[in-house]
Amino acid sequence: QPITDSQRLFSIAVSRIQHLHLLAQRLFSDFESSLQTEEQRQLNKIFLQDFCNSDYIISPIDKHETQRSSVLKLLSISYRLVQSWEFPSRSLSGGSALRNQISPKLSELKTGIHLLIRANQDGAEMFADSSALQLAPYGNYYQSLGADESLRRSYELLACFKKDMHKVETYLTVAKCRLSPEANCTL
């Protein structure tokens, strides 16, 4: 059975998000390993109480809800999550070689997801509202901060980026699986 354009696009998108998720994990663990143990404990405590900017994007709350979500819904949420990182990704801490890869990869992924949404819409105009939700680019993140506050912000941004890339990877993998006739799509 020949591979359809949609399956090929999904394979590329899943491969790209897996790479971005690995980059996010690497940036986060590099940042964590640069911290003192006490600093790390404090940041972990603070982060557990904080929210990511993207938490305002309505998404499935668990794997069961993810499994029940339509392909189009998973694609739309993925698009919004990727879009929400286009600007903040330029401020991620970490090695510049890694950081410089992120913005273009996010942009390519966003384009790919947009094509997948169009291919899976079947005339439904569900995508129009996604541009209505423009998240603030991490609020007051860009103010000049003291050293401790700057450290906390870098930690939050990297942790949120890692979390969101994991979400997108999960959603795209489930959506891709749904379009594959012989697949078992359990998480």
UniProtKB/Swiss-Prot annotation:
PANTHER family: SOMATOTROPIN, SOMATOTROPIN,PROLACTIN
Pyrrolidone carboxylic acid: modified positions: 1
Keyword set, alphabetical order: Disulfide bond, Hormone, Metal-binding, Pyrrolidone carboxylic acid, Secreted, Zinc
Keyword Metal-binding listed: yes
GO CC term (a single one): extracellular space
Disulfide bonds: 52-160, 177-185
Protein name: Somatotropin
Similarity remark: Belongs to the somatotropin/prolactin family.
Primary location class: secreted
Taxonomic lineage from the root: Eukaryota, Metazoa, Chordata, Craniata, Vertebrata
Organism whose genome encodes this protein: Thunnus albacares (Yellowfin tuna)
List of residues binding Zn(2+): 19, 169
InterPro entries recorded: 4_helix_cytokine-like_core, Somatotropin, Somatotropin/Prolactin, Somatotropin_CS
Subcellular location: Secreted
Keyword match ATP-binding: no
Biological process, per Gene Ontology: animal organ development; growth hormone receptor signaling pathway; positive regulation of growth; positive regulation of receptor signaling pathway via JAK-STAT; response to nutrient levels
GO molecular function: growth hormone activity; growth hormone receptor binding; metal ion binding
Domain of life according to the entry: Eukaryota
Protein purpose: Growth hormone plays an important role in growth control and is involved in the regulation of several anabolic processes. Implicated as an osmoregulatory substance important for seawater adaptation.
